[in-house]
Amino acid sequence: MKKTSLLCLFIGLLALCSCRQPVPRVSIFADHIATIAHQENISFAEAATRVRALSYEGVDVSTTIAADRLRTLDSLGFCHACAIANIGYIDGPQEAAEEQALAFMKAQGWSQLLLVPGLVPEGTDDDAVEEAIARIAAFVERAAGEGLRVMVEDYDNPRSLCYDTAALDRLFAASPVLGHVFDTGNYLYCHEDVLQALDHFRSRVQHVHLKDRRDDGSCPAVGGGIVPMAEVIGRLRASGYEGWLTVEHYGSRIMYDDASRSIAAVRAMMAK
């Protein structure tokens, strides 16, 4: 049998069973697949096929992803790990952006949404920040009423509404149902202890971004930096975490190689 036929058969079998595999499962960003396509000078579909063959089971996508790319991912059996919406709440009410995000979720069958709430301009007063937080809480409640889960991550910019533990605590105090996307590398970025942050927010963690970092701040493949990844994964599993582990290394110049190394490292850590 030709190699291409064997690959298609393998991917077909993955598509049939991957969404029913034991948790946690490993996913990747659709943006990383697009980067692979660009770096390898191949189509998005071919890049997605190669990534799927590495045994990635899910994908994180923007709610503005091109329709043809979304169809490709679905056809290859990628599970819906998490959708992502950038909504700048500090700029005022965001009805149009909210409607777009919710429409995508419902039309395409996604249940988890990472909300990236924008950056706070320098000099913004605290009343404006409180108004933005109230808008976020209202959107989260509305989405929950429609059966959707909304989360925020620890975002690596000091002007973010969810930059560090203190900022996240402020958001979570405003919404009992707001979830957390735990980004391992971003706690290191804001000079906080990753494991302490995990213990602090464990009850809110509903999705995970496995981002490693080097001392210079760059993001290598999982296991190539100084983030205690094995300990993070071990604590998540011990606590009964049933969500996704999405590998992340934006900025990689060898994205396919990093994707291959990352999933191998994560599988090895989970096998212990």
Predicted regions and their residues:
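Active-site beta-loop-alpha junctions enriched in small/polar residues
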Residues: 29-33, 62-64, 85-89, 118-120, ...
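Acidic/histidine-rich catalytic cores of soluble enzymes
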Residues: 144-226
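Active-site groove signature of glycoside hydrolases
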Residues: 105-125, 146-156, 246-247
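Structural preference for beta-strand elements that scaffold enzyme active sites
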Residues: 25-27, 58, 79-82, 111-114, ...
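Bacterial N-terminal signal peptides
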Residues: 8-15
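Conserved, mostly hydrophobic/aromatic
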Residues: 51, 59, 105, 150, ...
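N-terminal pre-domain/capping segments
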Residues: 19-107, 111, 179, 267-272
